Design a protein with these regions (language model features):
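Alpha-helical transmembrane segments of multi-pass small-molecule/ion transporters
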Residues: 1-231
């Protein structure tokens, strides 16, 4: 990594984190605005960037290993965490199992991959990240509700319920649609305009700030140290 790439990582990752934390401390941003930024990132920016990056992704069979490995990693991590935290409260169990299952791969790794290796690297990362995005709504959300219900029930018993249609067919899954459109354009050999490369480069920096500013906003060092002492 050269100095320019290192500076870009600092500017696009740590600066928005610090900005979000500062905005919260100064009360210059509300939680509603923070949630709005996160929704805009997931629904609009990720969809457009997936479409543009997958437009130039070479269609190769071995790329199927990326989503398969992503699913394997998520299930192994959650499976290893579940027995380790079984003696804690149901709420803490749910928190740890869901946290072990998911990772901020799509945003952080996507941006770093683009900075280091270019636009194709961003697409490769999204191939790995998309299964985790689907798992988040199909499995992680129901699991979180399940553990929360067990924590509030008598005897710690609660059913695991979810509506697959309501979970999958939401605006938050538009990123997958963008990916499929991009792959379709690649499949039918539609040439991508040259100006898109510069446009994508601009979107990477915008998306970094839109994505990481809310993360910085939600950082709570006091609660983090509390759980660190428990660990």
């Amino acid at each position: 990594m050269n100095h320019a790439q290192l500076f870009t990582v600092l500017f696009d990752v740590f600066c928005p984190l610090a900005a979000g934390y500062f905005l919260r401390r100064r009360k210059w941003m509300t939680m509603a605005q923070c949630n709005g930024m996160m929704l805009f990132n997931v629904v609009v920016l990720i969809t457009v960037m997936n479409l543009l990056s997958f437009w130039i992704l070479p269609l190769q069979g071995d790329l199927l290993l990326l989503p398969l490995l992503s699913l394997l990693t998520a299930f192994l991590s959650a499976g290893m965490m579940a027995p380790l935290c079984r003696h804690q409260s149901f709420v803490d169990q749910g928190t740890l199992v869901v946290a072990a299952m998911l990772a901020n791969i799509g945003t952080l790794a996507g941006i770093c991959g683009y900075i280091l290796y270019g636009e194709l690297s961003f697409a490769y990362v999204q191939l790995f990240a998309v299964p985790q995005n689907i798992l988040m709504v199909v499995l992680a959300f129901p699991l979180a509700q399940y553990y929360a219900a067990r924590g509030g029930s008598v005897g710690g018993k609660a059913p695991l319920q979810f509506n697959l249609r309501e979970l999958l067919f939401t605006p938050k899954q538009l990123g997958v649609v963008g990916m499929l459109i991009g792959l379709g354009l690649q499949l039918f050999q539609v040439e991508r305009p040259g100006f898109v490369t510069d446009f994508f480069r601009m979107l990477v920096h915008i998306q970094a700030w839109i994505a990481f500013t809310p993360v910085g906003y939600t950082i709570d060092f006091h609660r983090a140290f509390h759980y660190l002492r428990q660990a």
